[in-house]
Amino acid sequence: MLRNEIACTRSFSLRPLPLDPAQGRKEPPRHFANDLIRRLPDPSRSLLVGRCDDVRLKPRQMLQERNLPLRYAYFPEQGAASLTATAGNCLPVEIQTVGAKDFIGIPLILGMRVSPHRCMVQVPGRALRIEAEALIELIKSDVEIEKLLLRYVQATLIHSSQLAACNSRHSLQQRLARWLLIAEDKLSSHEIPLTHRCMAQALGVRRAGITTTMGDLEARGIIKQGRAQIELLDKARLEELSCNCHRVILTAHKNSLDATNPWRAINA
């Protein structure tokens, strides 16, 4: 009897089974292009991204309409959008170029459900989109998400106030150079796929003025123009022609989001 049990045990000796190729394989960590998403600690990032959809941004797509309820907020990952304000019967003027370092839906952070501004896609790309109610819920329940988004509000306030000063004090050439440098930073590319019409609207000036100034920059070898395309050839020289406002805006953005000391000068 014992022999039979031993023989049975030997015949059914445990051998390692071949592994399922998919078993034990970890999904590679996703790379997030949006700066705000990247800055969140892992638990908060997982909570936020878990409520988001990955969506395409199409040219001239309206992401936010003035004085209408906000259904979604966006964390752009690629491309660029233009946040604009209106002044009576005049054409809208850009108050912020929004890219992969930004967030669309600031009123939701502040407890509002409508925005006084429009936001339209200028350069196609992708974004993480979250429903307005889901974002409000996360802001209330996760202090890290709340703190980061409030810091972003601070950066945006500095951006808007600096633009007001720039538009009233500096020449068209300085302002255009500033706009190109900020667009290059938002897109993380030396190539800016926009028309003179878009730039004229962004700066609140006539298109003829943009065409003349851009022609001068091209003649000096600082940029190269194509069909709805601008390439920055000499960023250093463009910075020399620009006012200091682009540095103030970009530095304030970084310092606001990096802030660990509330007494630190944001735009130092």
Sequence positions of predicted segments:
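Cyclic nucleotide-binding regulatory module and flanking cytosolic helices
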Residues: 6-58, 103, 108-109
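A conserved hydrophobic position in a structured secondary element of the catalytic/binding core
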Residues: 40, 76, 98-99, 122, ...
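Alpha-helix/helix-capping structural signal
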Residues: 43, 78, 133-134, 155, ...
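Cyclic nucleotide-binding regulatory domains
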Residues: 61-123
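Structural motif
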Residues: 80, 125-127, 229
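Cyclic-nucleotide recognition modules
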Residues: 96-154, 158, 162
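Polybasic "coupling" helices that flank or enter modular domains
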Residues: 122-124, 139-206
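Phosphate-/nucleic-acid-contacting segments
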Residues: 182-268
